[in-house]
Amino acid sequence: MPRSLKKGPYVNYKLIKKIILNNLNLKKKKIIKTWSRSSTITPEFIGNTIAVHNGKIFIPIYISENMVGHKLGEFAPTRIFRGHSGSKKKPKK
């Protein structure tokens, strides 16, 4: 079930604080590391690179306009599908 509109989007307060400070720095924007996969992307995030933790490593994500409204965790997959096992039959001669 989606979040109530009257509550507004959830964004970790430390993350939004880092984003605002990064937006004020016009010379060089830093990559911001975060473990907050449940934070919603808001318009303030656009143009920043955020490294989202997937449980093992940080995956850098450049935030663009069409990502607004999605969660950060959607862009950092936690599982890697390696394929189903092949058939164990030997080929006939």
From Swiss-Prot:
The entry's keywords: Ribonucleoprotein, Ribosomal protein, RNA-binding, rRNA-binding
Gene Ontology annotations for the cellular component aspect, listed alphabetically: cytoplasm; small ribosomal subunit
Single GO molecular function: rRNA binding
Record carries keyword RNA-binding: yes
Bridged cysteine pairs (disulfide): none
InterPro entries: Ribosomal_uS19, Ribosomal_uS19_bac-type, Ribosomal_uS19_CS, Ribosomal_uS19_SF
Gene3D superfamilies per record: 30s Ribosomal Protein S19, Chain A
SUPFAM superfamilies per UniProt: Ribosomal protein S19
Keyword RNA-binding: yes
GO BP: any one term: ribosomal small subunit assembly
PROSITE patterns linked to this entry: RIBOSOMAL_S19
Pfam families for the chain: Ribosomal_S19
Family: Belongs to the universal ribosomal protein uS19 family.
UniProt function note: Protein S19 forms a complex with S13 that binds strongly to the 16S ribosomal RNA.
HAMAP family documented for this protein: Ribosomal_uS19
Protein name: Small ribosomal subunit protein uS19
Species the sequence originates in: Karelsulcia muelleri (strain GWSS) (Sulcia muelleri)
